Amino acid sequence: MPIKIKDDLPAAEILNSENIFIMPENVAFHQDIRPLKIAILNLMPIKITTEVQLLRLIGNTALQIEIELLHLKTHVCKNTSEEYLTNFYRTFDEIKNEKFDGLIITGAPIEQLEFSRVNYWEELKDIMEWSKCHVYSTLHICWGAQAGLYYHYGIPKYILKEKLFGVFKHEVTEEKEKLVRGFDDEFYVPHSRYTEVKREDVEKVKELTILAQSKKAGVYLILDNKGRRIFVTGHSEYDPLTLKDEYMRDISKGEDIKMPENYFPDDNPDRKPVVKWRSHADLLFSNWLNYYVYQETPYDLSEMPPSFL
């Protein structure tokens, strides 16, 4: 089934070219189906890139989904025009009285800052608090996962000695959980971050379960005991060349950055990377949307129970 987005959203052209099923608003309006309402709080600088990456995965499921793109009012975006945000995004104030089946909080390239020094931290805290009563299941990605773990459970992040950068092997640690249903025994995920959360800190919180981890990249997938909050420390949504683009960007700035691990064939940046994470990414998002959103959310969203009960 398709995703429903604004008819003139630029990401739609890219998704259509990849044969991702996009439904125009006027067609979706005439279908007697309640689509899942999914909000995406896009904290990344270049909005359209993240839109395409996430909508590609969401659009590959068998569900009709209505997307609401959100941006923060308290942060001035330097890489996306105000006109673009006005046309395709809404603010928290505009949607705070609505309820959603799901919410995605993306990463942001600010992980070396203390949370309190992030200029939009107060607004983000308001959104995470609001999500307890207005969102059935929230998927937090990379820095968004670290922010969520810190806000909801007081779990800190730690600065790494060097950037964790590359594509790393992971293993499932809780095979019976629905979120990892169908996962291979070993699977790969891209990571690009300067900070981490530690396993021992997560294990101290009885409401949380670690579902997957990596010897090199550490804790990867964390689930709360009600399935209402999911934390993903990597970037399974990344495009084939995202890590290359980040690497070349940092090299051009003169930064002392190592080549992404397990990414370029023979560690040759002139060779095309082999994608090892696409199937896992599709399965992660489809499992979340099916088992933790579609199967659990009441048909009438006004009947949604708060996550703290």
UniProtKB/Swiss-Prot annotation:
Q: Which cysteines are joined by disulfide bonds?
A: none
- EC numbers for this chain: 2.3.1.31
Q: Which GO terms describe its cellular component?
A: cytoplasm
Named in its record, the pathway it takes part in is:
Amino-acid biosynthesis; L-methionine biosynthesis via de novo pathway; O-acetyl-L-homoserine from L-homoserine: step 1/1
**One GO-annotated biological process of the protein:** L-methionine biosynthetic process from homoserine via O-succinyl-L-homoserine and cystathionine
Feature type site, description Important for acyl-CoA specificity? E111
SUPFAM superfamilies xref list: Class I glutamine amidotransferase-like (SSF52317)
One annotated GO molecular function: homoserine O-acetyltransferase activity
Briefly, what is this protein's role?
Transfers an acetyl group from acetyl-CoA to L-homoserine, forming acetyl-L-homoserine.
Record NCBIfam families: metA
Tell me which HAMAP family the record gives. MetA_acyltransf (MF_00295)
Q: What is this protein called?
A: Homoserine O-acetyltransferase
Q: What is the lineage of its organism?
A: Bacteria, Bacillati, Bacillota, Clostridia, Eubacteriales
